[in-house]
Amino acid sequence: EGSGFISKAIGGSHSKDHVIERYLDVARYLGAKVDSLDDVEFPMPDLSKETASVQHKLQEAGWQGGDYVVIVPGARWWTKEWPVEHYIELAKKLTADGTAVVLAGGPDDAVKGQKIAEGTASSLVIDLTGQTSLRELAALIKGCSFYISADTGPLHFAAALKKPLVAMYGPTKADRTGPYGSKNSTVLLSPAKCAGCLKKKCDNWHCMHDITPEMVY
């Protein structure tokens, strides 16, 4: 996406590997010293102000303190999204165990967040979709005990913050855009034969449907 605007292509030894490794090839070309991929870190900015803001929003929404799981139900391509009914079933399982669930994401995720919250019908579900800035979203994820989503941007916040996480992949490929460098991640690949097609449109959407709530839970 956007690669068509590049005026000079730089090909490195990782041209078919994870996108971060490709970016590091560009960094090497520009003179940066990258000794080992094992040394790659993703430092985050000071989020103390945003942490206080997020905790206030959580408390206003009924959070009683303690651990919470963050679920981000949206993705840039609709084909990458896990079905809302699957999220509802998962949230019911989590809240039945007494686990607080915080739904998060941008304004485009608000309808999905509302449906999941209403479908779960539990006071342990807090819907903050569309109610945080990007930095507040990072702070929210920093404070969580666990993170769950499909292939979407906030997933990489969770990986950078070294959070335990579950990431679900259907039309996209985890070896290309998966949670990089995370030792606490569980990547669930769709069992569908068409998985990894990289299509933004689909007639059946089997791949994400075939990842069941039981597999995630």
List PLM regions with ranges.
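Catalytic machinery of carbohydrate-active enzymes
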Residues: 1-217
